[in-house]
């Protein structure tokens, strides 16, 4: 779900 998040 984000550039620095896995989802």
From Swiss-Prot:
GO terms for biological process: neuropeptide signaling pathway. The modification Phenylalanine amide is found at residue 7. Keywords: Amidation, Neuropeptide, Secreted. It comes from the Eukaryota. It is found in: Secreted. Its main location: secreted. One of its GO terms (cellular component) is extracellular region. The keyword Transmembrane does not apply. Belongs to the FARP (FMRFamide related peptide) family. This is FMRFamide-like neuropeptide GGKYMRF-amide. The lineage of its organism: Eukaryota, Metazoa, Spiralia, Lophotrochozoa, Annelida.
């Amino acid at each position: 779900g984000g550039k620095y998040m896995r989802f």
